[in-house]
């Protein structure tokens, strides 16, 4: 909704509502072997150490096991696929014994309701200056639960934490996923395992001022905001009987920041630009809870991230060359990271939170476009950057087999950000004439790091193994 108050003042108000539903299925197993043909313990490399020097895995018996696994996978393409007939047969066999399904398909659901009210006032103070003032209020409700998608021919399945059976005796309340409905029978379409909602409330007020002053164009902006979040559990987990059902406390955060950006026209096609910013940013809900599938606990030492950012750039334009050169530096303090993964060695899901983590991001970027002819351009792009942790972090982890937390130090200093090239380059030719557009490009990527597992960087076990100094 737009309200033109006068020819220099305008108020724009927006109301937005959005509901989304997302689900994904997964083949799972219960008190039996992993049926995936690419399960690492079924691959040849798990039996014999081909490239290493571990004598324990280089015996004649290990080599024979390697050959057996290799021959099995190469004998038929069917051996490299899931054998659904075998899974159905296994479930039908245990039906007569009154045992729960050995294999089943679960469905994870993440549904999201988001409502936003925002308003912005724009005031043209002069022909060369503008002031903006606005606010936004956001409410978000995320529903997260798991249902039984397909029992694969089985008759029964109970809402029991089978991962913890080795830790607690059969029949123990600690094994119940929902003490409000103990030993509940799960049919296709029923919820099991976990069911909770995350409620997030946000509000912020912001303002910015822009002005063109001769050869200088600049903008100053600031904002202050509130973030609140809580968890509402729908199941009373046996490992956290008093801290999993119902609403948690609400975590409250005051956030805010300011930034400056400006550019100066030096003439003859040259422009220099500068940007600076500092912000206190509230943690997001997806990293704020220690084990949201199990309890209401927030991550310990949860704080605002402190973010400093800066950028300096130079741009040159003339009839035959367009060039951009820029450098940037950013630092993040008090970062929080959260991961959950299945730890096969102990048959458990592990919930890990890293807090007090400091990071740096810096680099340089160059882009050039040469006009070789009226219809042919040569383009060159390149970047070299760094994105890494500059400190160790506090770690707290919880395994789904037991309801106890472990605190330690994660030795993650100098670990890089994963999944993105820190060095990249591109060369290309662009042809455009007579309605035809043809591009030929060559790209180069380097320093793409794999993600690391915090589990293998806990200080206490590494000290016991004498794998670290001090």
Outline where the language-model segments fall.
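Surface-exposed extracellular loop regions of Gram-negative outer-membrane beta-barrel proteins
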Residues: 175-185, 228-239, 250, 264-310, ...
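Extracellular loop and loop/strand-boundary signature of outer-membrane beta-barrel proteins
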Residues: 102-107, 120, 155, 189-195, ...
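Outer-membrane beta-barrel transmembrane strands
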Residues: 1-28, 100-144, 188-217, 250-255, ...
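Transmembrane beta-barrel strands of outer-membrane/channel proteins
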Residues: 15-19, 133-139, 220-226, 260, ...
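Signature of Gram-negative outer-membrane beta-barrel scaffolds
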Residues: 104, 130-267, 287-293, 394
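A surface-exposed, glycine/aromatic-enriched loop/edge motif typical of exported proteins
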Residues: 20-89, 143-175
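Outer-membrane beta-barrel transmembrane strand signature
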Residues: 60-111, 187, 194, 407
């Amino acid at each position: 909704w737009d309200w033109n108050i006068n020819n220099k003042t305008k108020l724009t108000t927006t109301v937005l509502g959005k509901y989304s539903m997302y689900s994904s299925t997964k083949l799972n197993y219960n008190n039996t072997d992993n049926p995936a043909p690419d399960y690492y313990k079924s691959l040849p490399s798990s039996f014999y150490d081909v490239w290493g020097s571990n004598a324990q895995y280089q015996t004649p018996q290990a080599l024979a096991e390697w050959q057996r696994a290799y021959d099995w996978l190469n004998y038929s393409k069917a051996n490299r696929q899931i054998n659904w007939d075998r899974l159905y047969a296994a479930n039908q066999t245990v039906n007569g014994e009154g045992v729960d399904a050995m294999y089943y398909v679960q469905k994870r659901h993440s549904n999201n309701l988001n409502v936003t009210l925002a308003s912005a006032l724009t005031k043209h103070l002069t022909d060369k200056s503008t002031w903006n003032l606005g606010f936004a209020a956001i409410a978000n409700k995320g529903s997260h639960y798991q249902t039984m998608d397909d029992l694969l021919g089985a008759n029964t399945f109970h809402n029991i934490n089978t991962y913890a059976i080795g830790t607690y005796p059969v029949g123990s309340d600690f094994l119940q996923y929902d003490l409000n409905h103990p030993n509940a029978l799960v049919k296709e379409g029923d919820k099991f395992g976990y069911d909770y909602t995350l409620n997030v409330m946000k509000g912020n007020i912001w303002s910015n001022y822009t002005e063109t002053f001769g050869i200088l164009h600049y903008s100053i902006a600031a904002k202050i905001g509130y973030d609140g979040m809580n968890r509402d559990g729908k199941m009373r987990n046996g490992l956290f009987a008093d801290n999993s059902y119902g609403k948690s406390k609400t975590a409250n955060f005051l956030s805010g920041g300011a930034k400056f950006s400006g550019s100066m026209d030096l003439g003859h096609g040259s422009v220099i630009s500068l940007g600076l910013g500092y912000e206190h940013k509230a943690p997001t809900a997806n990293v704020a809870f220690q084990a949201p599938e199990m309890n209401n606990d927030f991550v310990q030492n949860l704080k605002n991230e402190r973010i400093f950012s800066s950028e300096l750039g130079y741009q040159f334009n003339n009839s035959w060359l367009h060039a951009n050169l820029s450098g940037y530096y950013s630092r993040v303090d008090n970062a929080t990271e959260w991961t959950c993964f299945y730890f096969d060695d102990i048959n458990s899901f592990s919930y890990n939170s890293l807090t007090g983590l400091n990071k740096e991001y810096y680099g340089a970027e160059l882009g050039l476009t040469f006009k070789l002819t009226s219809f042919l351009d040569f383009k060159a792009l390149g970047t070299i950057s760094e994105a890494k942790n500059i400190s160790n972090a506090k770690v707290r982890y919880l395994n789904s087999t037991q309801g106890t937390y472990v605190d330690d130090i994660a030795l993650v200093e100098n670990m890089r950000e994963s999944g993105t090239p820190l060095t990249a380059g591109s060369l290309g030719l662009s042809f455009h004439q007579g309605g035809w557009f043809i591009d030929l490009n060559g790209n180069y990527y380097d320093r793409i790091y794999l993600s690391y597992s915090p589990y293998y960087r806990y200080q206490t076990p590494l000290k016991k193994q004498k794998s670290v100094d001090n």
